[in-house]
Amino acid sequence: MKKSLVVITLLLLFVSRAQTNNVEEQGVITIVLMVKNEQDAMEKTLEPFVKAGIKSFLIFDTGSTDDTIAVTHQFFKKHHITNYVIEEEPFIDFATSRNHALDAADKHFPNTTFYLMLDAEWYLHNVKGLIDFCNLEKHKNTPCYLLRIINNSIDFSVPRLIRASSHARFEGVVHEIIPVYGSVKAPRDIYFELGVSHYGIEKSRKRWERDAALLLKEHEKNPTAPRTTFYLAQTYECMGEIEKAFHYYKLRATQEGWHEENYETFYRLGRIVERLSATDPNYTWPMAFEYFATAHNLMPHRAEPLVHMAYHYWPDGVGPSNAALCYLFAKRACELDYPEKDMLFIDPGAYNFKRYEILSKAAWQVGDFANGETATRNALQAHEMPHLLNNLAAYITRRAQQQ
């Protein structure tokens, strides 16, 4: 009898690699975090949630060889969190592994209302606001909600707040997405700040190499899938393999897909051609201009292509020989609102600084002093730079002379 009990106990130990700690107490939100070798990021990633009073956590480790799991246990122990589970399972692909994490959350946290699925080095601002939002939304049936991810150079939205009862799941081996997410966004003041540590940058480089291999394999299986083609091109662009990126963006331009990806494809083609034209005569500014113009035509409320066009006509060291063309594109860019409803790859710098900075210079040359002064003041709100202070002084002097 004792021998049988020992065998049963051993079997139970090896049925699952889950490490479970008192999961009966559940709130409106359970944090679901998929990680691998994130020992240096775990505390900072998890801390905002603990400080805001969230007590339910599922950590899905896909093969850490560092101290990620030990650091996580220590963190929860230090903060007296007992309602957590650590699951271990080898990485498969991003959609499959995330879906397995959600399956584990369903199993261990059956009474929670929402899962917030994030990555390490995604630092959530306004966790209290998220809790309040979830309490307001908990009796509705929206399957998932978009949350912003921002840093100094990018602003986009992803469906990572998931209603547990919807059983919504991800698709896509890389740059996975939940196809039923719709367009309901959490309030703008609830957002992830994307970490940019040296540690994170090194991990990004390794991930791009892995992503490229996964996407290329998927592309070979289904060469007409527009999302796969787009992200294969984008991954090569991130890796610095610009000609490969150009090839796949050109292919993506022939495939009809999501309208924001259609726009982004032509915008990135313009950027790549403009960059290559500096060293390769096979790429020219008229080619880049056509791509930028197509992008703007697809989404005329977006300023980024116009900003690139404006800067082209005011190149460093050349001066205002094309000031009128520069002014034309810069002024239109400054008339556009920040695209709050868009989800994909907004460039905050183009809206908060660049468009105003270039109009500050161009407006003077064409005699539009009022708009030039306004643009200068707007640019200075983002960056107090010496040439802008000089421009402002010139505009103020000019205005005083006209009075």
Task: Describe the function of each predicted region.
Residues 73-104:
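Conserved donor nucleotide-binding strand/loop of the catalytic core
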Residues 96-103, 109, 115-116, 122-247, ...:
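Catalytic-site signature of metal-activated, phosphate-bearing donor transferases
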Residues 231, 268, 275, 308, ...:
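"A position-specific structural signal for the A-helix of alpha-solenoid helical repeats
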